[in-house]
């Protein structure tokens, strides 16, 4: 998900659907900052982007097709884990939550389809309240032309 309101406030264009890790990291780095001068980071680039999203974005999986071997020692998996850690470190140890996203203080958040449905009104669910406009987009890929989707 992309918080359109936050990007507009920061004069940042909404990324294209074929964005990459480099673009994603650069935007998150720009957006993660102390906005009120109290020394505490209160605006964030991303919430809830973890190793699972990074593995999918890098086109790799945790186990071999037959399920007999763990593949974490492969270079693509290692690269994905390193990227997830790099993204996590941007928040400088701040413990983010869904509430932080709902308050409009986070620019990007990967979501499962079931989570998406709680933000979009439909007959069996009440729309979750938010004070910002948002849009959906594929997660950034490790490299150009490799659109990623959220696992799950």
Regions found by a protein language model. Give the residues of each.
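A conserved hydrophobic position in a structured secondary element of the catalytic/binding core
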Residues: 2
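Paired acidic/hydrophobic, glycine-rich loop segments that form the ligand-binding mouth/hinge
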Residues: 107-112, 117-119
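Aromatic-glycine-rich donor-binding/catalytic loop that engages nucleotide-sugar donors
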Residues: 5-17
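Short helices/loops that flank or line small-molecule/ion binding pockets
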Residues: 7, 25-30, 95-109
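Extracytoplasmic/periplasmic substrate-recognition and gating elements
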Residues: 124-152
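Extracytoplasmic/periplasmic solute-binding protein
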Residues: 8, 22-70
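Glycine-centered hinge/linker elements that transmit conformational signals in sensory
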Residues: 25-30, 66-96
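Loop/turn elements at helix/coil->beta-strand transitions in domains of secreted/extracellular proteins
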Residues: 33-44, 104-107, 130-135
